[in-house]
Amino acid sequence: MENKLLSSQEIQELRKSLPTWEEAEGKLVKRFKFTNFIEAFGFMTKIAIISESLSHHPEWTNIYSEVIIRLSTHDMGGITMLDYKLAKAIDAIKYE
C-alpha cells in the first residue's frame, strides 16, 4: 500500500536500490549538483511534472546549481512507498 508508513526495516531494504539517498529526520534526502542554474531548474521542472502525475510533491531547495530534495509523506508523518517511487523517478531523470 502506497500510503502506509514504512518501518525502519522496510526503509533500509528499499534504500538498497537508492544508495545515494540518505534517511534523515524521517525523510529521504539527496543533494544534486549541476553546472549552472538553468540545468538545476530544468531538472526541477521535470520533477514537477512527475510529481503532479503522482499527486506527491517534494520539499526542495535550489541555490544556483544545487538542488536538495527531501521526500516524506506529510499526511503520514514519514516515509511511504510514494516517497520511494518518487525518489526512483528522480534518479531516472538525473541520469537519463
From Swiss-Prot:
**The enzyme's E.C. designation:** 4.2.1.96
Q: Which domain of life is it from?
A: Bacteria
Protein family: Belongs to the pterin-4-alpha-carbinolamine dehydratase family.
Pfam families named among the record's database cross-references: Pterin_4a (PF01329)
InterPro entries assigned to the protein according to its UniProt record, in alphabetical order = PCD_sf (IPR036428), Pterin_deHydtase (IPR001533)
Alphabetical GO biological process terms: tetrahydrobiopterin biosynthetic process
Q: Which PANTHER family does the entry mention?
A: PTERIN-4-ALPHA-CARBINOLAMINE DEHYDRATASE (PTHR12599:SF0)
Q: Which GO terms describe its molecular function?
A: 4-alpha-hydroxytetrahydrobiopterin dehydratase activity
The name this protein goes by in its record = Putative pterin-4-alpha-carbinolamine dehydratase
* Record keywords: Lyase
What is the reaction catalyzed? (4aS,6R)-4a-hydroxy-L-erythro-5,6,7,8-tetrahydrobiopterin = (6R)-L-erythro-6,7-dihydrobiopterin + H2O
